[in-house]
From Swiss-Prot:
Belongs to the eIF-2B alpha/beta/delta subunits family. MtnA subfamily. InterPro entries: IF-2B-related, IF-M1Pi, IF_2B-like_C, Initiation_fac_2B_a/b/d, M1Pi_N, NagB/RpiA_transferase-like. The keyword ATP-binding does not apply. It comes from Persephonella marina (strain DSM 14350 / EX-H1). One of its GO terms (molecular function) is S-methyl-5-thioribose-1-phosphate isomerase activity. GO terms for biological process: L-methionine salvage from methylthioadenosine. The gene is mtnA. Substrate binds at residues 50-52, 91, 200, 251-252. Coiled coil: none annotated. Keywords: Amino-acid biosynthesis, Isomerase, Methionine biosynthesis. It comes from the Bacteria. It catalyses: 5-(methylsulfanyl)-alpha-D-ribose 1-phosphate = 5-(methylsulfanyl)-D-ribulose 1-phosphate. This is Methylthioribose-1-phosphate isomerase. Its EC number is 5.3.1.23.
Length: 353
């Protein structure tokens, strides 16, 4: 069994959150201190930290930080709703953020009704955020364990965006499957989509793979289909920002394109995500709000203009892949091999989710 590094993107010290500034990678590994909920919200919005599971975890920590901040300032706990709303409104697509915030909000309501206050209340909220953090890490390890079984002993696997330790509490979802396969001695080569316009593949996934010593090639997004046509790609694994009741998946823009190409070439297309990514209150992908970010992210690269100033750009951050194009969804509870509403509902119910 190979030795794998344990990269962790966030640390909690003295009720302050320290995060790796992912905008500086791969050139510089800079840790930023976040000591107010406003700083946490800004870090999520600016994608200093990103990845659906991680923004949920950071949102939970941000809520605890916000409650402490309000109490330290001598304000009423009625103002805590402002903290919740500010964090909730940072990014609209990833459901993990809303799931984590709802969880800590319900605990906050219960504990205040029980008469918990002051330092005791703050400590309870930080412990709950730490619990969410730890649960995610264990979920990722389980996802990796289940998912690596799907990969042959020798496998060229293509992945999109960043779904590794930097997108989670550690280890990762889709990249966690690859980590687990490599750790277990499989001959894995990873083909990393650069993932325009934010380049999470080239900046973050490639950085993680270098850290781990996992063989990989960085590819342009528009070369994926050609590699499939040449028989180079054996499997595709991506993450998810939201999975609806019928199995449609919202993920980083470009995922749908890969799914269509995978189907055309007979290549298995896997989605790896914790069960907290399922949104059973949303029927299908057409109901998912899709974040549209600044056109400057498309028109600039590395601080340089790459398009005429007069040109307008579209910058949808996510797309939706229909359930019919997904081979299986890998979760910490096991693998959903029939991706439709009936099988998802039964799977989650039988496993106590």
């Amino acid at each position: 069994m190979r030795k794998i590094k344990d990269i962790r993107p966030i640390q909690l010290k003295d009720h302050k959150l320290y995060v790796i500034n992912q905008l500086k990678l791969p050139k510089e590994k800079e840790w930023l201190e976040l000591s107010t909920y406003q700083q946490v919200a800004e870090a999520i919005e600016k994608m200093i930290i990103r990845g659906a599971p991680l923004i949920g975890i950071v949102g939970a920590y941000g809520f605890a930080i916000g409650v402490k901040q309000i109490l330290d300032e001598g304000r009423s706990l009625d103002d805590v709703r402002d903290v919740f709303d500010r964090l909730k409104n940072t990014r609209p697509t990833a459901v993990n953020l809303f799931w984590a915030l709802e969880r800590v909000w319900k605990k906050f309501e219960r504990w205040t009704e029980e008469g918990r206050s002051g330092e005791e209340l703050v400590n309870l909220l930080f412990k709950e955020a730490e619990r969410i953090d730890l649960e995610d890490y264990h979920a990722n390890k389980a996802i990796g364990g289940y998912g690596q079984v799907l990969l042959p002993e020798r496998c060229n696997v293509l992945t999109h965006c960043n779904t590794g330790a930097l997108a989670t509490s550690g280890w990762g979802t889709a990249l966690g499957v690859i980590r687990s396969a490599f750790e277990n001695g499989k001959d894995i080569t990873v083909y990393v989509d650069e993932t325009r316009p934010y380049l999470q593949g080239s900046r973050l996934t490639a950085w993680e793979l270098v850290e781990e010593g996992i063989p990989h090639y960085l590819i342009t997004d528009n070369s994926a289909g050609f590699l499939m046509s040449k028989g180079i790609i054996d499997a595709i694994i991506v993450g998810a920002d939201r999975i609806t009741a019928n199995g449609d998946v919202a993920n980083k823009i470009g995922t749908y394109t890969l799914a269509v190409l995978a189907e055309a070439h007979g290549i298995p297309f896997y989605v790896a995500a914790p069960t907290s990514t399922f949104d059973l209150d949303t029927d299908s992908g057409k109901d998912i709000p899709i974040e549209e970010r600044s056109q400057l992210e498309v028109k600039k690269c590395g601080g340089c203009d790459i398009a005429p100033e007069e040109t307008e750009a579209l910058n949808y951050s996510f797309d939706v892949t229909p359930a019919s194009k997904i081979t299986a969804i890998i979760t910490e509870k096991g693998i959903i091999s029939h991706v439709d509403k009936e099988h998802i509902t039964k799977f989650l119910r039988y496993r106590g989710v």
